[in-house]
Amino acid sequence: MAKLITPGIFQKNTAEDYLKAAIDTAEWIDTLAIKTEYGRIWQALPEGQDGYREDVPLFTPEKHSWGFWNCQCQCCGTAGILEHFAAMYEYTGEKEFYAYMIRTADVMLSDSDHRTPGLRTWYDSWWRTIPTRVVSYPGLYVGVAGCASSLLRTYAALTGKKLTNLYEYHFFEKF
């Protein structure tokens, strides 16, 4: 674990110290590069550091974190995770992504309110300082439309139907 950095340390360091640290960091990053005739490329993770794959089934989608909130939105909630897993299953066909997609859809559906026959909605509390203010947003990025679009994307992935991409996965179509 890194030692605590105190303000006194910054007073003792010079501009040359920071420059040397920047150069050392750049040289270290360069050791991770794969040299090709066209230049250098970097793997997403260095060899042997793909342990994140073991963490995904432990924490997503049932447990939440600072980046994955207990909310129904595309940016940081269950709808966005479902959109990701459905797209990855659609593009790769891997059973791992299929399992994540189904688990996430189950969690999203269990978080919904369907007491009115034929209707389903999701509620959120966005005001951390007013936890009693709970609302159902209709929006695509934050709200019911986004939840429904992720479920629709899941359906399309399961049935092989093509949908217009609503989010950032449009660049995969080039490959």
Predicted regions and their residues:
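Glycan-recognition and catalytic cores of secretory/periplasmic carbohydrate-active enzymes
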Residues: M1-F175
